[in-house]
């Protein structure tokens, strides 16, 4: 149960970081 929650949270963090990187690359 905790493992699935941790996995989902990690995926959310990765997607968020990816969005920031893509956004920065688009701005610059």
Swiss-Prot record:
Q: What induces it?
A: Expression is regulated by the mother cell-specific transcription factors sigma K and GerE.
| Membrane topology value | Single-pass membrane protein
UniProt cross-references to InterPro entries, sorted A to Z: YjcZ-like
Could you confirm whether the keyword Calcium appears in this record?
no
Task: Identify the NCBIfam families for this entry.
Answer: tiny_TM_bacill (TIGR01732)
Please summarize what the entry says happens upon disruption of the gene.
Spores of the null mutant show partial lack of assembly of several coat components, including CotB, CotG and CotH, and impairment of response during germination.
Instruction: Tell where it localizes.
Output: Spore coat; Membrane
Biological process GO terms, please?
sporulation resulting in formation of a cellular spore
What name appears for this protein in its UniProt entry?
Small spore coat assembly protein A
Q: Which UniProt keywords apply?
A: Germination, Membrane, Sporulation, Transmembrane, Transmembrane helix
Q: What does this protein do?
A: Spore protein involved in the assembly of several components of the spore coat, including CotB, CotG and CotH, and in spore germination.
Q: Which GO terms describe its cellular component?
A: membrane
What Pfam families does this protein's entry cite?
A: YjcZ_2
The residue ranges crossing the membrane are: 8-28
UniProt lists the family membership as follows:
Belongs to the SscA family.
The scientific name of the source species is Bacillus subtilis (strain 168)
- Coarse class of the primary localization is other
Q: Would the keyword Transmembrane helix turn up in this protein's UniProt record?
A: yes
């Amino acid at each position: 149960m905790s493992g699935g929650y941790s996995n989902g949270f990690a995926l959310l963090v990765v997607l968020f970081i990816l969005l920031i990187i893509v956004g920065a690359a688009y701005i610059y």
